[in-house]
């Protein structure tokens, strides 16, 4: 087991054991457990674990997806309920998400490294996904819909063209 794997295991244990509302709290708890990490590293770990902040009566806290483990999908399975729609035009795919969810979903897509994806750009609730190579955006939209468990609403008649 690598040091990164041990650190992610510690992150998962901490999130399961108590209410963690911020990354600062989580970094402090990690340090008390003997792990040093930057905020950027912690963000990547949270994405790989499929962790997300959920609102409750006492404020937002982190929770893990069903299995809380790394997966080949980069944590996409844990984020499925946060996608509102997926659409494609002739050049790109647009994913609409619940407010604040786009960065985590884009990061999970990037971590999963699907060969069909050249890259992602995320705002607060919208993600632009550029298809790799000659892949048609409509096919990429269908693949992302499959990964995210979301029906795709394919837009535009020209969505199957590569240029």
Swiss-Prot record:
It comes from the Bacteria. Its main location: cytoplasm. Pathway: Amino-acid biosynthesis; L-arginine biosynthesis [regulation]. InterPro entries: Arg_repress, Arg_repress_C, Arg_repress_C_sf, Arg_repress_DNA-bd, WH-like_DNA-bd_sf, WH_DNA-bd_sf. It is found in: Cytoplasm. GO terms for biological process: L-arginine biosynthetic process; protein complex oligomerization; regulation of arginine biosynthetic process. Keywords: Amino-acid biosynthesis, Arginine biosynthesis, Cytoplasm, DNA-binding, Repressor, Transcription, Transcription regulation. The keyword Mitochondrion does not apply. One of its GO terms (cellular component) is cytoplasm. GO terms for molecular function: arginine binding; DNA binding; DNA-binding transcription factor activity. Signal peptide: none annotated. Gene3D superfamilies: 3.30.1360.40, Winged helix-like DNA-binding domain superfamily/Winged helix DNA-binding domain. Belongs to the ArgR family. Regulates arginine biosynthesis genes. This is Arginine repressor. It comes from Anaeromyxobacter dehalogenans (strain 2CP-C).
């Amino acid at each position: 087991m690598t040091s990164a794997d041990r650190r992610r295991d510690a992150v998962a244990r901490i999130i399961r054991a108590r209410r963690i509302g911020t990354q600062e709290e989580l970094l402090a708890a990690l340090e008390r457990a003997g792990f040093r990490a930057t905020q950027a590293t912690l963000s990547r770990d949270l994405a790989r674990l499929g962790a997300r902040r959920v609102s409750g009566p006492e404020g937002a806290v982190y929770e893990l997806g069903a299995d809380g483990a790394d997966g080949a999908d980069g944590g996409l399975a844990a984020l499925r309920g946060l996608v509102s729609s997926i659409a494609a035009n002739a050049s790109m795919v647009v994913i609409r998400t619940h407010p604040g969810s786009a960065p985590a979903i884009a990061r999970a897509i990037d971590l999963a490294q699907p060969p069909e994806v050249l890259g992602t750009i995320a705002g607060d609730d919208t993600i632009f996904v550029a298809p790799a190579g000659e892949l048609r955006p409509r096919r990429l939209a269908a693949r992302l819909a499959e990964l995210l468990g979301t029906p795709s609403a394919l837009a535009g008649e020209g969505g199957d063209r590569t240029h």
